UniProtKB/Swiss-Prot annotation:
Sequence ranges assigned to domain WH2 in this UniProt record: 382-401
Organism of provenance: Dictyostelium discoideum (Social amoeba)
Molecular function (Gene Ontology), one example: actin binding
Biased composition (Pro residues): 320-356
Protein known as: WAS protein family homolog DDB_G0292878
Composition skew (Acidic residues), residue ranges: 363-373, 457-472
GO BP terms in the entry: actin filament polymerization; actin nucleation; Arp2/3 complex-mediated actin nucleation; defense response to Gram-negative bacterium; endocytic recycling; exocytosis; lysosomal transport; phagosome reneutralization
Cellular-component GO terms for this entry: cytosol; early endosome; early phagosome; pathogen-containing vacuole; phagolysosome; recycling endosome; WASH complex
Compositionally skewed regions (Low complexity) per UniProt: 300-314
Length: 472
């Protein structure tokens, strides 16, 4: 769409005076309207662009004011940037001023007569045009006399289509061949100097211009440079590196001094400070009860062993040491309804009296020997036997029962009562335990007899030694 939307009528020639005046007035009015419209449009665009410039200037002033407030402060400053990076600015196409306006229709002025009434045009005599013809002739004669007579000395008229000014000039000269041209002018012909270097060009003498020297590739040819004689490697020189001593903090202007400043704001990842309870926590009192009881039980066993050893040493009988690293006893099995309740524990104040070894040993000795051998000496099985483990679990209860039998009841050699309700798992286990105890009792009785004989011989040897020492 064309941007030329205004049209101004031009006063035509050959009109009467009144028509000429009216057309002149119409043309001036139209020109004034066009002028006002153009300048109002331009003023509106200028004011719009000026408002944009003022907005940018205000933003610059605000930024400069903030910078001026920061300048001079020696404290560290936190600068917060937007979370989203600003998008690329989209530059819009330039909109012309008159792009939204359309070309106005042209209304020429038409005047046909001086009178307002419709009257036919009267033919004027030819004498009335003589003065006008004289004026036209005089104007033409003035134009012809003012023009210079063109002399045909060049190549002719300048062509209508010339791409540039360089095409208008002669090569390597500043002369226009279309205006002045000499056939004797030859820039390529060399001269020896003197008068031959000057050529008559028109009425002036023009000095011939020599061409520049040919390039090296034309003079010497396409010869390649010898690469062996050319050093293209880097050869650094030896020099001492300067040593500078600067303080840790330079007193520079407009530079923060508190380098070790720490932000007081909340971290962007607060979950790092939280401690996660990934592992279960245990109470120290509950968790340490088992090992404490175990250690206390071990200490009690050690004390009991020491007491037994001391008592045995006092009577001259050596007892085998009891195991102190025995595993903790398993929980007791559930008792049946027909089983009698366990006997009460013995009094703690007075320990039970020690009985000398004899052929018919009690069940408490059997239990001690069984503990020493670990259940591996009998014909029943090995240490890891299930029945032996169950028996070890009931060791304390059985010992209490045996201690109660030493008071003279005479029932310490009897096996524990077995429930008559056959077919149950616990009943079978108790039967197996009874058989096991009987087999162990028979084997232990023989061991006790051999052991007592050995101790008697040792006592006799000791008495003989004392007698010999007395005689000496």
């Amino acid at each position: 769409m064309t941007t030329q939307i205004y049209q101004v009528p031009v006063v035509s020639n050959g009109l009467r005076e009144t028509e000429s005046i009216l057309q002149i007035v119409d043309s001036l009015e139209k020109l004034e309207k066009v002028f006002n419209d153009m300048y109002s449009t331009i003023s509106a665009r200028v004011s719009h662009e000026k408002s944009r410039i003022d907005n940018v200037a205000n933003r610059l002033n605000n930024a400069q004011h903030k910078v001026n407030q920061i300048v001079g402060s020696k404290q560290a400053i936190t600068v917060f940037s937007s979370a989203k990076y600003p998008a690329d600015k989209k530059w819009g196409d330039y909109v012309p001023i008159y792009s939204g306006k359309h070309k106005l229709p042209f209304k020429p002025s038409h005047y046909h007569g001086l009178n307002s009434e419709d009257s036919p045009i009267k033919k004027r005599p030819e004498d009335s045009y003589l003065d006008v013809n004289d004026l036209v002739f005089i104007e033409k004669s003035i134009d012809t006399t003012s023009k210079e007579v063109e002399v045909k000395e060049g190549l002719g008229r300048i062509p209508a289509q010339i791409p540039s000014v360089s095409n208008l000039l002669l090569f390597n000269t500043q002369e226009n061949p279309y205006k002045k041209y000499s056939n004797t002018l030859d820039n390529l012909s060399g001269g020896d100097g003197g008068e031959d270097d000057y050529t008559i060009f028109g009425d002036q003498l023009s000095k011939k211009k020599r061409l520049g020297d040919a390039p090296v590739t034309v003079k010497d040819g396409d010869s390649r440079i010898d690469a062996e004689n050319v050093k293209i490697g880097y050869e650094p020189g030896t020099f001492e590196i300067p040593v500078y001593n600067f303080p840790s903090i330079l007193p520079l202007p407009n530079v923060a001094e508190n380098i070790t400043w720490a932000a007081e704001s909340q971290s962007i990842a607060p979950s790092q400070k939280a401690t996660l309870n990934l592992l279960p926590t245990y109470d120290n009192s509950n968790s340490g009860s088992a090992p404490v009881n175990q250690s206390s039980g071990g200490d009690n066993n050690v004390n009991n062993n020491n007491n037994n050893n001391n008592s045995n040493n006092s009577t001259g009988i050596m007892q085998p040491p009891q195991p102190t690293n025995a595993p903790p006893p398993p929980p007791p099995p559930p008792q049946s309804a027909n089983a009698p309740p366990p006997p009460p524990p013995p009094p703690v104040s007075a320990p039970p009296p020690f009985n000398p070894p004899s052929v018919n040993s009690n069940n408490d000795d059997d239990d001690d020997d069984d503990d020493d051998n670990g259940g591996g000496g009998g014909p029943g099985g090995a240490i890891g036997d299930l029945l032996a483990d169950i028996r070890r679990g009931h060791k304390n209860r059985l010992k209490k029962a045996d201690v109660g039998g030493d008071n003279g009841d005479g029932e310490d050699n009897k096996p524990p009562p077995v429930s008559d309700g056959g077919g149950g798992l616990m009943g079978d286990l108790f039967k197996k335990l009874a058989l096991r105890r009987q087999s162990i009792a028979t084997t232990k009785s023989t061991k006790k007899q051999s052991k007592s004989k050995k101790e008697d011989t040792d006592d006799q040897d000791g008495e003989s030694d004392t007698d010999s020492s007395e005689w000496e």
